[in-house]
Swiss-Prot record:
Database matches in Pfam families: Coagulin (PF02035)
Cellular compartment(s): Secreted
Taxonomic classification: Eukaryota, Metazoa, Ecdysozoa, Arthropoda, Chelicerata
Annotated protein name in UniProt: Coagulogen
InterPro entries named among the record's database cross-references: Coagulin, Cystine-knot_cytokine
Organism annotation: Carcinoscorpius rotundicauda
Amino acid sequence: ADTNAPLCLCDEPGILGRNQLVTPEVKEKIEKAVEAVAEESGVSGRGFSLFSHHPVFRECGKYECRTVRPEHTRCYNFPPFVHFTSECPVSTRDCEPVFGYTVAGEFRVIVQAPRAGFRQCVWQHKCRYGSNNCGFSGRCTQQRSVVRLVTYNLEKDGFLCESFRTCCGCPCRNY
């Protein structure tokens, strides 16, 4: 596992030049591969995905930017979390990750193919620890949940469906 792996998706340290690992050549290769999937579908028309006939995209393509909403990546939408009544302040932002670390800590290129019409977005719900509204006894805890995203395997020239951790909420916990 890579020691640079951050707590949550979209927190990858840009300072290490990691963004440069996804070169224009790699981006072009991914675009072409995604275009090929779209062409296979033979489907035209709006309202449903061009990619749903492909098993990996069907299983894993739920975070298309055009349909994903902030609440899709909130913890309380996933078992075993329940919606905590007291939550410390959260900053919410969306991102389009081009790479990340899987739950197993493995570095992956995440599929982004804007030209082919497939972009993946994840909303981060990160604790703003500076303003801790949990009272005197509680503490703000960063919750994480798992999202499944389409990745691209450069060695095998193929798509995979893989799990990543994303920051999803900040319940107050008593210790």
